[in-house]
Amino acid sequence: MNKKYDIAVVIGRFEPFHNIHKQLVDKALELGEKVVLLLGTAKVAPDPKNPFTVDFRTAMIQSCYHGEDRKRLNFNGLRDKPYNEALWLAEAQNIIREYQDDIIIEKNIEYTDVTYHAALGQVKVALVGYEKDNTSYYIHKFPQWTLEHFNGNTPEGKVLNATDIRKMYFEDDRYEHLVPPEVGTLLHSFKSTQTYIDLKQEYSFTKQYKADTRFVNAPYDPIFNTTDAVLVCNGHVLLVKRGFNPGRGLWALPGGFLQSDLWILDNAIKELREETKIKVSSERLRNSLKGFHVFEYPYRSFRDVVVMMRLEQDGFQYLHCQIMKISSLKTTLK
């Protein structure tokens, strides 16, 4: 096998993996001895925008390939870092560097600590990028890799958007012609799962919510602010389970919508006490404040204002809600 590059990198969410995505991976297989797919938005709770786990997305892509091509595909989850792009870039680079290290060993490239970066330079890496819209700007953020542009359109010359396919999927429209047959089979099977049933209910809830006449005729898109309290004690965090959509059944921070007549901190304390029935005074909670942060990533479901608090070590003896070790939260999503 004599390919132009040692590694061809493809970055995407693939929710779901559709026909143009397959063309993208096909091109990567033409260019690289080894293809590394970085599956974005990894380890998040499922919602109608990101319904599939990394494992399921991997299965969708693998189902489309066989033999040697399938063996050449390598999959890694890549978590979003919307408030720290440098960290996101570093994580992607570190994943690829591990593959570069393997190839250095395979090729018996000798190096010392001083010449290590020169050795890395002998491993040819390309990013196969699909510049679909303004969300694809990241493909220009890896100058150390050669950028191989991919221009994929449908036979009619249109851009195929996974957002439209998800809409068809949750509204029971025909989408099968837009995805590889193997993916269509997996998506059909997924419809029988409880996860799909819950997501479809959430999709319908959100669609109806957005269609509310109070917002349809507004001169500007409505922005809904919420205040959520992060209450920490002895390495544990206080969580509540959502009883309604969106996110019914998921663990969440206690909080709610910001009332127009309340300060942010007052609203956070009010919601915390109402949702958890915590037997700690508002004054004590206010005095326990360690800081707050605004999370305004525009692709969040809503614009959230998260107020962070920390109680004394005995703070949880009065709680009637679930507390979890912070360290355990890292392993709950796959």
Where are these regions (language model features)?
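Histidine-centered active-site/metal-ligand motif
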Residues: 18-21, 309-310, 332
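Short, basic and Ser/Thr-rich N-terminal targeting/leader segments
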Residues: 10, 223-225, 312
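NUDIX/MutT-family hydrolases
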Residues: 148-150, 313-334
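Active-site segment of metal-dependent pyrophosphate-handling enzymes
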Residues: 277-322
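Short, well-ordered beta-to-alpha junction loops that form the rim of enzyme active sites
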Residues: 129-133, 242-243, 314
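N-terminal strand-loop-strand
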Residues: 207-253
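The catalytic Nudix box helix
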Residues: 61, 253-292
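Nucleotidyltransferase catalytic core that binds NTPs
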Residues: 1-214
